A protein has these predicted regions:
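Short acidic (Asp/Glu) patches
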Residues: 30-35, 64-65, 79-91, 138-139
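RNA pseudouridine synthases
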Residues: 97-127
């Protein structure tokens, strides 16, 4: 099942994608190409993983981590499909990060790896937008690098776990203005989804609608105002957002 939320005639409508159309709870059909998408659900806590793909640490001049490197993203950074990402004024290097996002469906603490997938509700597409200027200095862990308003585009759909046969065998691609800039596969993760869920739940309780951004492969490049970022995760969806200058 692929579900989401749209704004229609001033009201929030919960929708399901079926045969290329969006159907709301009243049975009314909507065109996905014209729909005003909202976040597909209301996320709780947003966790991110840094350096979780083979080769990504190397392109940054860093060593691969021995255990998951975690950070949090603030709720104000969340952004729906097609909404504009604001490029902060005065920064030199802003880039996309195409990621598979895991959505928790069942609460748990100290979850063993063997049971971790039982706690996964589904998946969506994320773009972990980052200001490279603030990575590798006193702002790491990257609150200032990754926590700006509009820096976590998410969506457009929540895809139920049963629709994704193997989340560790998916292609990821990022395009800027239609040009392929980043390509990888989820089997390049250093830490698998069960390992990540088990690791996080050792020291905190995971709750329904917590979101885990599982990291990005190598292939980052700069984006500017006027660019359009398109993130694709096989079997999950396509997330697109334009870049605009920050409004003051």
């Amino acid at each position: 099942m692929r579900t989401g939320r749209i704004l229609h005639r001033g009201r929030v409508r919960r929708v399901e994608l079926r045969e290329g159309r969006l159907y709301d709870e009243a049975g009314e059909a909507h065109d996905p190409d014209r729909a005003a998408f909202l976040l597909p659900f209301e996320p709780r806590t947003i966790f991110g993983l840094a350096l979780n793909y083979r080769g990504h640490a190397g392109e940054l001049g860093l060593e691969e981590p021995k255990e998951p490197v975690l950070f949090l993203k603030p709720p104000a950074s969340l952004l729906p499909h097609r909404a504009p990402v604001e490029r902060p004024q005065g920064v030199a290097y802003l880039h996309y990060e195409c990621e598979l996002a895991v959505v928790i469906g069942r609460a748990g603490r100290r979850i063993p790896e063997r049971a971790a997938m039982d706690h996964v509700l589904g998946y969506t597409v994320a773009n972990d937008v980052t200001v490279r200027d603030f990575v590798g200095n006193l702002f790491r862990p990257p609150v200032k690098a990754k926590g700006w308003d509009t820096f976590t585009p998410l969506g457009p759909y929540l895809v139920s776990a049963d629709e994704v046969a193997d989340p560790h065998a998916l292609a990821l691609r990022a395009y800027v203005n239609g040009e392929l800039r980043q390509e990888g596969r989820t089997d390049q993760m250093l830490f698998s989804i069960p390992e990540i869920v088990a690791y996080l739940s050792r020291f905190l309780t995971l709750e329904p609608y917590d979101v885990i951004l599982t990291g990005t492969p190598r292939g980052l490049s700069h984006v500017r105002a006027g660019d359009v970022m398109r993130m694709e995760v096989e079997a999950v969806g396509v997330l697109e957002n334009p870049v605009v200058e920050e409004s003051l």
